[in-house]
Amino acid sequence: VLKVRPDLQVLLTDVDTSLHMNNGRYWTLMDHGRADIMIRSGLWRAIVKRGWVPVVSAGQIRFRREMKLFQAFVLETRILTWSEGHVVMEHRLLSKARDGKPVLNAIALVRAGLYDRRERRYVPMSRLLEEIGLEAEPPQASPEVEAFLRAEETLKSAA
């Protein structure tokens, strides 16, 4: 499963009045992680050519450790599993402790898909895989992913 891992740093534009990363900035960085996967996989060409629109339908985040101004970190983005029209992705923001050991600052799960405006539906995963020349079956969803998807369905029915 494709995974991207760019090196980043908390900048002045990322922080709030406490000089740690603003909660909303995490989501923006995760948008960049998803775009990075689309570009590196070659899917971006098809997205532009066919007028597909990336859409996030659900997300859940757990903040574990604050990220301070100028702190270096890595954003890991990977696809965990998929259904017919959506993928579930994991985003992990990791920094290093003083002893060099990795620190998990935040972790998020996101459900997303590519919407075809002409067809008025989400693009099937089989079509997306075909566009990038892959054949694959979705990995088994972990208990955490299953719980996330159940919670998303519950919220969806309440809306």
Question: PLM ranges: what are they?
Answer:
Residues 25-48:
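Active-site helix/loop of acyl-thioester processing domains in fatty-acid/polyketide metabolism
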Residues 67-74, 78-159:
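HotDog/MaoC-like acyl-thioester-processing domains
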